[in-house]
Every structure is written in structure tokens, then in C-alpha cells.
Amino acid sequence: MSTLRIALVAGEASGDILGAGLMRALKVQHPAVEFIGVGGPLMEAEGLVSYFPMERLAVMGLVEVLGRLRELLARRKKLIQTLIAEKPDVFIGIDAPDFTLNIELKLRQARIKTVHYVSPSVWAWRQKRVLKIREGCDLMLTLFPFEARFYEEKGVPVKFVGHSLADAIPLEADRAAARAELGLPEGPLVALMPGSRGGEVGRLGALFLDAAQRLRAMRPGVRFIMPCASPERRVQLEQLLANRDLPLTLLDGQSHKALAACDAVLIASGTATLEALLYKRPMVVAYRLAPLTFWILKRMVKSPYISLPNLLAQRLLVPELLQDDATADALAQTLSPLIEGGEEQTRGFDEIHRTLRRDASNQAAQAVLGLIGK
């Protein structure tokens, strides 16, 4: 069996999870394989030789990216040169489309096979990117069925592989066991999840804590749990919590345990909303961006929804409160009835979970190996 050399680039924590799962499946299906590129700790643990820390790519928002643009462009140029010299059997860009799509285009021009894993939101905005994808990408692997339909219509080779989180998370999570593990009492419990990036927590952290205080005034028995994505986010949240009298437990990571344990979630729009959906926890989605970023996006977005649960349901399944509509009072009022209710949401969540549960990492690995004839 000849040794395969596979290059992968992931740009943030969610991509690191998907990349590690794909690498594990590739090693089972083709044990003689080595991995190069850029990834986080999970991908490195599976054997990736990472050229630089993945955190250097984790930037969100049009305005925010501008401040780091020179560094990002320089890193991408160097990465393209390195990968063309290394000549991997296949390159897999995992999400991070503004960084990886250009790499795919250049590598494909150099006759290197290219795969993009996780569709960018081309169906929602900047639809002309599909032309670049068609030119630069031998195969698109999508997590969601509505994305695969979009690419089929546009003539892009595509495979819907499902989502590895839907495989990993049980159809019915044990709330009592999760609470026992975390040492949490019975009674109403709300998870607060203001995001994993510093900018997100800066815009949403205090707002979510204000909403928690309003909710506590409406429902004196309610308690809160807040997972911190990193030590840096914990410091940031501890500063925001100072001088607030809230029955709140901070966790280091453990977002899945927090979701399993809670009754409802106040959550930033992003990948975590999919996790909340898979745990069948009723949610209210909120988001704030830099005002200029929001103004630009509002004029570009084609989709009526921003959150994954609504995009997957193709209807308004969960409330979305954005920008100026995301006030502490509005969030508390919208969340309160979901603590004991939310059955319509959870029914929809169960249906979506079953659709996405397809053994994603193995499906993706088979598709990659099929592309390169292995």
C-alpha cells in the first residue's frame, strides 16, 4: 500500500473537530497516510504536522478581518508555495472559505486534487463564489442536505455526508446524569453561550448576563451555567461577572455537558446552535456584530434566517434576535416560556437530527479516497 500524503487546512475549533474525525476515518480506511497543513490540537493529536497555529486564522467579521488582512494574505501565499512544492495527493480545505478557497484554486491549477469540506454560505450571500468553487474544487462535501441541492443545481460535484456531531450526540441526552456529573441541583437551569471568540464575548457576554438577571427577576428559582471556550474567554467572562449576584456556574469547556444538563439555552448564532439542536434544548439565538459589518451583511444576505436550526428547518423554528433587537429584556421575555415549554422546537430538532445522522467522517473519507482512486 503506497503512502498517501494528505494536506488539510482548518481555520477554527469547529473545523478542528471535523478534521480530526476525517483523519481518524482516513487512517482506518487507508492506514499508510501522513497529514500536513494547518489545524488545531485535535488534528495534531491525529498526526497532523501543522505549519503554524490554527488560532492565527480564527477571525470573524468583515471589519475585524481588515485589521489582520496583511498577515492572513502573507500566510496564505506561503502556504500555497509550500503545498505546491510538497505535492500532496489531495488538499482538503475545512471551512474557513475566505482563506481556503483561494488555496484550492491555486493548487488545482497546479494539478493537485482539491476537496472543500463544509460549504460556505453561498446560498445565503455572495452567490458568485460558487463560480470560484466550481473552478477550484474537485469535490464539495456538505454537512447539510439543502446545501447539496444548491450545488447540484450549480453543476458542482458534491456529496452530502451528514454531520459528525449528529453521529456523536445521542438522540436523547440524559439530563439527570449530566447534572449529577457537574454537581448541579434539580430545578430550572439555563445555559448561556455567548460565543467562543473574544469579539463575540465582548459584544454578547454582558448582554447575556443582563438578560440572565432579568430572567432571574421573572423566575427567582432559575440557575445558570456558562461554558468557557478557552482560558482567555474564562478571564473575560469572570471580569464581566464581577459585582453581579447571579447563581451561575462557569465551566472550562464542557459545552456538551452544559447543553445536556440545561433546560433551555441563550446562544450566539454559530456552530453551537447546531449542538443545542442535537441536544434537543429549546433556544433563543442572539447576535451582534460591529455596526458596519452588520450594515454590509444586511444588504448582502439572501436568506431570511441566520441560525442553523432555522436554515435546516427552512422555517422560523427558533427565535432570532439580532443587533438592536437583542436587548436584555427581549431575550429574557423570549427565553422564559421555553424553560418549561419549547415542545415545537424539540420536535423539529429530533427530525433534523435523524436526517443528519449518516456516519459523516466515514462518508467523507470514502469520498476523498474515491476522488483520488484509492
From Swiss-Prot:
> What is the originating organism of this protein?
Pseudomonas fluorescens (strain ATCC BAA-477 / NRRL B-23932 / Pf-5)
Pfam families in UniProt: LpxB
Gene Ontology MF, one: phospholipid binding
InterPro entries for this protein: Glyco_trans_19
Q: So what EC number does this one have?
A: 2.4.1.182
Known PANTHER family for this protein?
A: LIPID-A-DISACCHARIDE SYNTHASE, LIPID-A-DISACCHARIDE SYNTHASE, MITOCHONDRIAL-RELATED
- Function (record text): Condensation of UDP-2,3-diacylglucosamine and 2,3-diacylglucosamine-1-phosphate to form lipid A disaccharide, a precursor of lipid A, a phosphorylated glycolipid that anchors the lipopolysaccharide to the outer membrane of the cell.
User: Gene3D superfamilies, from UniProt?
Assistant: Glycogen Phosphorylase B
| Biological processes annotated in GO | lipid A biosynthetic process
- Annotated catalysed reactions: a lipid X + a UDP-2-N,3-O-bis[(3R)-3-hydroxyacyl]-alpha-D-glucosamine = a lipid A disaccharide + UDP + H(+)
Q: Tell me which family the UniProt entry assigns to this protein.
A: Belongs to the LpxB family.
> Cellular component GO terms, alphabetically?
membrane
HAMAP family per the record?
LpxB
Associated pathway: Bacterial outer membrane biogenesis; LPS lipid A biosynthesis
Enzyme class label:
transferase
Q: Which UniProt keywords apply?
A: Glycosyltransferase, Lipid A biosynthesis, Lipid biosynthesis, Lipid metabolism, Transferase
Tell me what this protein is called: Lipid-A-disaccharide synthase
